[in-house]
Swiss-Prot record:
One of its GO terms (biological process) is translation. Belongs to the universal ribosomal protein uL2 family. GO terms for molecular function: rRNA binding; structural constituent of ribosome; transferase activity. Keywords: Ribonucleoprotein, Ribosomal protein, RNA-binding, rRNA-binding. This is Large ribosomal subunit protein uL2. The keyword Ribosomal protein applies. It comes from the Bacteria. Part of the 50S ribosomal subunit. Forms a bridge to the 30S subunit in the 70S ribosome.
Length: 235
């Protein structure tokens, strides 16, 4: 792992879940300071080959990033895909190219059944879908104007054939999910969560009662929205 490239980094100010002094998002506090790496999600440097110079760690995402040095001297970060190693070449184009891992082109030029990542939902806005570690989408149908992709969640999405996508699956690595101390959550900006049954009735629908008993209602949030399987997404 190499050190960051300062010209490709930004200082991102933390809001800590506050909006003008008032808590707008609960359970969020100050986190460890880190630089934001500018990732090339648009892949709009067309028909210029680039070589993978090094692999970097990015604290803002759970996938590794690759530093690409193009033949004209410009450097950009992209999300590392499987089988993309140092000294490999990548290219982005609107025309047909070899479907190697890390290359980027429009959906029109990609075969059905190919695994892709960093998929645009509208042309020229940058990759939106399948950007986290180990994620992938699959092209399952194409016609003259549109294509259908299957997202990691199983949802099928209809998009334009002019949307860009990167070939391959996002790289995976072992992520330690076990927390050895409470401070590890504070590093991530996560504050403690108080249970509703431990509150007073004025603070939560589950509050009050004698001992550990509370009102006999279904599990719900602070604002009375049902939880435990209740779907909130509108179709």
């Amino acid at each position: 792992m190499k050190n960051k490239i300062k010209s490709l980094c930004l200082i991102k100010k933390k809001k800590s879940g506050r909006s003008r002094g008032k808590i707008s998002v609960r359970h969020i506090g100050k986190k460890h300071k880190k630089f934001y790496r500018k990732i090339d999600f648009k892949r709009d440097k067309y028909n210029i080959k680039g070589i993978v110079e090094s692999i970097h760690y990015d604290p803002n995402r759970n996938a590794r990033i690759a530093l690409i040095k193009y033949l004209d001297g410009e450097k950009r970060y992209i999300i590392k895909t499987n089988n993309l190693e140092i000294s490999n070449f990548v290219v982005s184009s609107l025309n047909k190219i070899s479907l190697n891992s890390g290359n980027s082109t429009i959906i029109k030029n990609i075969n059905i059944g190919t695994l892709i990542n960093c998929v645009e939902i509208f042309p020229k806005i940058g990759g939106i879908f399948s950007r986290s570690s180990g994620s992938e989408s699959e092209i399952i149908f194409k016609d003259n104007k549109f294509g259908v992709i299957k997202l990691p969640s199983g949802i099928k999405k209809k998009i334009s054939l002019n949307c860009m996508a990167t070939i391959g699956k996002i790289c995976t690595f072992n992520v330690k999910k076990k927390l050895y101390k409470a401070g590890q959550n504070r590093w991530r900006g996560i504050r403690p969560t108080v249970r509703g049954v431990a509150m007073n009735p004025v603070d939560h629908p589950h509050g009050g009662g004698e001992g550990k008993t509370s009102g006999g209602r279904h599990p719900c949030s602070l604002w009375g929205i049902k939880t435990k399987g209740y779907k909130t997404k509108k179709k």
